[in-house]
Amino acid sequence: MSVKVDGMINKKSKTHSKKLDARALAEKIKKNALKQQAQEEPAKEENVAENFDTVVDPTAELKFKSFNELKLIPELLEAIQQMKFTKPTPIQSEAIPHALEGKDIIGLAQTGSGKTAAFAIPILQALWEAQAAYYGLVLAPTRELAYQIKETFDALGSSMGLRSVCIVGGMDMMDQARDLMRKPHILVATPGRIMDHLEHTKGFSLKNLKYLVMDEADRLLDMDFGPALDKILKIIPTQRTTYLFSATMTNKIAKLQRASLHNPVRVAVSNKYQTADNLVQSMMLVSDGYKNTYLIHLLNEFLGKSIIIFTRTCAHSQRTALLARILGFSAVPLHGQLTQAQRLGSLNKFKAGKANILIATDVAARGLDIPSVDIVINYDIPTDSKAYIHRVGRTARAGKSGKSISLITQYDLEMYLRIESVLGKKLPKDPSPSKAVLDTLHVHVDRASAEAIRQTKDFHEKRNPKKNRDDRDREER
């Protein structure tokens, strides 16, 4: 027997003779969530207050309003104009003048803030005079972000004869060694793979390195790159300029700052828990057994829109992408169990509009330049509030409007309430489709789900991953 409760379809429990008091349960969950949040947040806020001397209001007057004011070389200004950088972002306005003076920088800035150009422009300006090999090393937590950073350097250095290389896991070591022997100016790398080359590639050394950048340092540490970072810091020269950028400030980041930077200028230009004003956020209560059905219903509702669907695991990403394809949607997966070529293929198809649905783990939540995303759907709600902020931040960018929808089951209520607490507001509930619509759609979805599960099993059986340091630059699942 089924009953419909507030948009959710559930089977009556046979093991409980009394009805649960839903309101009391919700209040208990909320109380526990708020208590836990209160215990966690003061420490985080204290870290930010302690480690950041300069907190900049993003709406404050910019230190410079045009890149022409910076006395950059003509070749760099030409590239900036070609990239249509009309005015600096707040992080660029704060960081670039100090960086051009040769100071170390530590910046608290979110994805999409323009921080890549904030460190690339000063490095390229200095490189013009030096023209030295292995001049700058940029460390990134993920392969996709590393490739994206390289693209920015290449675009800004297009008139300078810049040589850059991307050194990440999942690619052939010998090919990369040959690239390194061509004496590139800029290296963009994941820590595990660049450490492999420092240890095993004959003739490769960073003894003359002048610039070190650690981008998204919080993720570098979250993904267990700490030991590799320690080794790299011991190998490279102490007389260098260092930039450290992070979305959040923690004790680990503060420790890394003390170990790697010298009298840095500290700048924060973002609110950790801020979402864009032009982002419409909502949730939809769903039955766990009907989750795929609700998702396909939403894809039908937003047919033709550019959509990112976030899942918690690689398996969910792969299976959900297959499900969507079987039902006629143009969807591609993006997760850490794909090869590097497959991941770049999925990303490029989505960015080019050849596929309008990207189904990803949190690898796509930060750092990647994915323009014009209309809708973000949290198929699996994230396990922490920061991840939620980063996910929904993939839409409503550059002044455009956007929408995010989170599918919430009865098992997600505690985490959902914690997210609402951090946001400081309740998310409106979207209406559910009628039971008749769901039941009709569920028949087709159920059949397609069985086929998607079979194909996912085949995908995993064909995989034969190498278990070495190459895989330490895997993505968050």
UniProtKB/Swiss-Prot annotation:
SMART domains: DEXDc (SM00487), HELICc (SM00490). Pfam families: DEAD, Helicase_C. The keyword rRNA processing applies. SUPFAM superfamilies: P-loop containing nucleoside triphosphate hydrolases. It is found in: Nucleus. This is ATP-dependent rRNA helicase RRP3. PROSITE patterns: DEAD_ATP_HELICASE, HELICASE_ATP_BIND_1, HELICASE_CTER, Q_MOTIF. ATP binds at residues 109-116. Its EC number is 3.6.4.13. One of its GO terms (biological process) is maturation of SSU-rRNA from tricistronic rRNA transcript (SSU-rRNA, 5.8S rRNA, LSU-rRNA).
